[in-house]
Amino acid sequence: MEGEEMKRKLCILLCGTLAAGMLTACGGKNEMTGSETNAKSTGEEETVTIWHDGDEAIMGVIEDTVNKKIADENVSIKFEKKTGLTDQLKLYGNDQANGPDMYLYAHDSLGMLAEMGILAPVTDFISADDEADLLPMTVEAGTYKDTQYVLPLYYESLLFIYNKDLWKGALPKTTDDLLSYMKENTDVDAGTYAVVNQHSTAYNVAPVINGFDGYIIDKDAKPGLDDANTIKAVEYNKKFAELMGEGDYDTCNTLFNEQKAQAIIGGPWLVSGIKDAGINYGICSLADFTLPNGKSLAPYSGVQGVGILKYAEENKKDAITSVLKALCSTEIGVALAKESNCAPANQEAYKDEEVAANEMIMAMKTTAESAEPMPNIPQMSVMWGPAESMLAAVNKSGEDVEASAEKYQEEAEAAIADMQ
């Protein structure tokens, strides 16, 4: 009997110990998932960490503006710069202890990150009403396979930048008239040009390709180098390339800054150098030029926005929701435009008097109506090589457009197949 009684007591003791252990484990889990609620209830501030690899000054503008806007919600953001951001996210995208809550980067990396399964949809946090003031093109840029993973903040595109002291008369309204002006005002032997552009760089020829309804690659990862409209576009662009000779990035910039070219097709990143060169410059949108088919030039647009790491949704959903709503605001857009000279994703920001007076920003706003977001699918990374080889073959080596298109279409298809 004593033995049976001892067994009964031992059983009770073990069961009690096991139950206590289970309660401790459940309590620990509740403490983790409820950390945000606990922080709010005790008045502690919840910090949302955002990794970036961009301009520290721009991040400072965003950080200051957001933190002022959500100060009464016990939430703040903190930017941390990480060189080689996509590689860092590959390493830490599933590491809650060492990774960020969010990241800010160019939208064209989205497909790769989404395929890794590390991102949470923006729509898990905010509604379409919250994003109602955002330019549709920028929202499209942050969408991959019908799911929005990136909230857009600002964007950029190619522009038509001209020297007001050299340009003769009014700017043309059609690309045909622009071509005529170039023929009349270009002297290759003397080294003076009307307009310079990187004609063997796919990004710089994309405005013509897109405007002709051609494409470099579509959303289904099908290369479009041999598409009939792409071929027409490259044939048409060749007329402009023939008036230039070599036109790499440095050559084009030097020609314009040394006032040997009246105009250049380039992005907002050129403006500081142009100012330093003392040039009296003007800017207009590429969308202001109409192609022979009646459509506007349609450059690619690069959009900078924020994405959310999936594990952060579990622990900081309320805090991140507050941050995203603040980032959607007109105040952020106005601050980015005024303090950083960025074209904001928020449409209401352009109603600000000072923003509306900014020629470069308003030119990009016009461009946003026809611009196409740069493809954000992973396969785009292997398309630049074949596309630019095709353009170089046509514009530098004088090869037949259709033959080159066929050759480099096959090369592109092989490169994509190798990614599988």
PLM features per residue range, with description:
Residues 67, 235-316:
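Extracytoplasmic/periplasmic substrate-binding proteins
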Residues 11-15, 26-110, 292-293, 315-318, ...:
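Conserved N-terminal structural module of periplasmic/extracytoplasmic solute-binding proteins
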Residues 90-91, 98-101, 129-165, 193-194, ...:
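A structural signal for short loop-to-beta-strand junctions that line the ligand-binding cleft
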Residues 107-158, 173, 177-179, 187-189, ...:
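Hinge/lid segment of periplasmic solute-binding proteins
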Residues 69-134, 165, 170-173, 262-263, ...:
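Extracytoplasmic "Venus flytrap"/periplasmic binding protein-like
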Residues 337-393, 417-418:
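Long, aromatic- and glycine/proline-rich binding clefts that accommodate carbohydrate-like moieties
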Residues 147-153, 158, 177-223, 229, ...:
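Extracytoplasmic/periplasmic solute-binding protein
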Residues 182, 220-249:
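Glycine-centered hinge/linker elements that transmit conformational signals in sensory
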